[in-house]
Amino acid sequence: MKPPFQEALGIIQQLKQHGYDAYFVGGAVRDLLLGRPIGDVDIATSALPEDVMAIFPKTIDVGSKHGTVVVVHKGKAYEVTTFKTDGDYEDYRRPESVTFVRSLEEDLKRRDFTMNAIAMDEYGTIIDPFGGREAIRRRIIRTVGEAEKRFREDALRMMRAVRFVSELGFALAPDTEQAIVQNAPLLAHISVERMTMEMEKLLGGPFAARALPLLAETGLNAYLPGLAGKEKQLRLAAAYRWPWLAAREERWALLCHALGVQESRPFLRAWKLPNKVVDEAGAILTALADIPRPEAWTNEQLFSAGLERALSVETVRAAFTGAPPGPWHEKLRRRFASLPIKTKGELAVNGKDVIEWVGKPAGPWVKEALDAIWRAVVNGEVENEKERIYAWLMERNRTREKNC
């Protein structure tokens, strides 16, 4: 048994000692069968939430009404959820109620896809009542039971299906894909925040180039912020090297580029992304527009962007041109290292010095003067030494006065 399961085994053993059934379930079991890195380990049990909280000394009630308790075991947190069935769903988003049951199979039956409806006992024996292992072997994503019913219960499952295409490289089962096409309008009931979580995982998947065209083919794009009418662009995005991107702002910048978004800020805000992501993606796009080729960076542009942003710009450019970014990254690193200063804080002078030298009250002119100074230093027009900058600034001011 793999270490992540061994570390949680004590929880299952204690539940069993108290007379309850308990199994590993969900994505961790799926990823074990796929040979992928195992993430969070979840446990399903016949014990009621209050039983779980009575058995374990350290628990956190994160949703006992819906059956889930976090058990802290050997310093790690594990979600332990009571076997349950879902009642009727409201607004295509969540069940109105849940019913706790004693059957593992009944619990697995409510899950979204067969590959996620697999359990494993304490000895490593796989319990697979819905053909999840066969779906994994065939590399297909298929719903548990009737696809239309699953998607009408929670419309976000349609986005999850396409997200799993991106993460795993699987294909949608024909009946599953057809049900998404038929029920795509239900996505309008889902909050932007939930859609954004799935979209970010989709963009970060190693097979994003397969998943993005699927948004167009299934019609889901019509109900996603800013993607309506972008079928052609989403299909063309299949040619981009999405796995080359490591940062979320790079992925959103490339999506804007792929879609031909003219104003990135309204588009990104519609996804309710953090301001930092909106600003950084916008800055990357602005640099791409201002700097048409990797070799076109000026010293001023490189200094203003900073090394990390400059590397991101060239990573995004590489993703849509197909030229590996490594050589240009190395050149930019060398160029940045050769700059006499790397930040404005490294200037040998400050605003107080400039005011004292010029003898004028503080005002907007001080920033203009400091900007002129750092540009001159970065371009090698003056050394970053106080006396030399003083002489350069005085000469600049005399020249400007003559020309007035």
UniProtKB/Swiss-Prot annotation:
Highest rank taxon of the organism: Bacteria
UniProt comment concerning the protein's domains: The crystal structure reveals a seahorse-shaped subunit consisting of four domains: head, neck, body, and tail. The head domain contains the nucleotidyltransferase activity. The neck domain provides a specific template for the incoming ATP or CTP, whereas the body and tail domains may be involved in tRNA binding.
Annotated CDD domains: NT_ClassII-CCAase
Keywords tagged on the record: ATP-binding, Magnesium, Metal-binding, Nucleotide-binding, Nucleotidyltransferase, RNA repair, RNA-binding, Transferase, tRNA processing
Chain positions recorded as CTP binding sites: G27, R30, R111, D154, R157, R160, R163
Cofactors demanded by this protein: Mg(2+)
EC category name: transferase
Site (May assist in discriminating ATP from CTP): D112
Enzyme Commission identifier(s): 2.7.7.72
Residues carrying the site annotation Involved in nucleotide selection: E153
Binding-site list for Mg(2+): D40, D42
Xref: InterPro entries: Bact_CCA-adding_enz_type3_sf, CCA-adding_enz_C, CCA-adding_enz_firmicutes, NT_sf, PolA_pol_head_dom, PolyA_RNA-bd
Protein name as it appears in the record: CCA-adding enzyme
Miscellaneous: A single active site specifically recognizes both ATP and CTP and is responsible for their addition.
Molecular function per GO: ATP binding; CCA tRNA nucleotidyltransferase activity; magnesium ion binding; tRNA binding
Binding site residues for ATP: G27, R30, R111, D154, R157, R160, R163
Function: Catalyzes the addition and repair of the essential 3'-terminal CCA sequence in tRNAs without using a nucleic acid template. Adds these three nucleotides in the order of C, C, and A to the tRNA nucleotide-73, using CTP and ATP as substrates and producing inorganic pyrophosphate. tRNA 3'-terminal CCA addition is required both for tRNA processing and repair. Also involved in tRNA surveillance by mediating tandem CCA addition to generate a CCACCA at the 3' terminus of unstable tRNAs. While stable tRNAs receive only 3'-terminal CCA, unstable tRNAs are marked with CCACCA and rapidly degraded.
GO biological process, one term: tRNA 3'-terminal CCA addition
Family under the similarity heading: Belongs to the tRNA nucleotidyltransferase/poly(A) polymerase family. Bacterial CCA-adding enzyme type 3 subfamily.
NCBIfam families hit by this protein: PRK13299.1
Subunit-level organization: Homodimer.
Reactions catalysed: a tRNA precursor + 2 CTP + ATP = a tRNA with a 3' CCA end + 3 diphosphate; a tRNA with a 3' CCA end + 2 CTP + ATP = a tRNA with a 3' CCACCA end + 3 diphosphate
